[in-house]
Amino acid sequence: MYDFPLTGAQKTFLRGLGQTLDASVKVGKGGLTPEFFTELQKHLNARELIKVRFVAADRDERAALAPQIADKGRCIWISSVGATALFFRQNPDPARRVIELT
């Protein structure tokens, strides 16, 4: 798993930023495919904070998929509401960071 500890205040800040985002990546009937993770990496590298929408998954499946995405996608699962989940990965290059956490 991506090991970057966030404080409660930082997670609250990121959830606030995430409210205005549209879902960047969608998980369909195919589940967590290599193509999904390629898209996930592309969007995380560009934006750092993304929303993932679960199209064909019930509540239990969504609860199981979100930690798997965080683990395999090397990112942090911030929160889930309904059929969407919010993920964050800070860019290792300080010059390319989109979101500054304090």
Question: Positions of the model-derived regions?
Answer:
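Positively charged, polar, low-complexity stretches
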Residues: 1-102
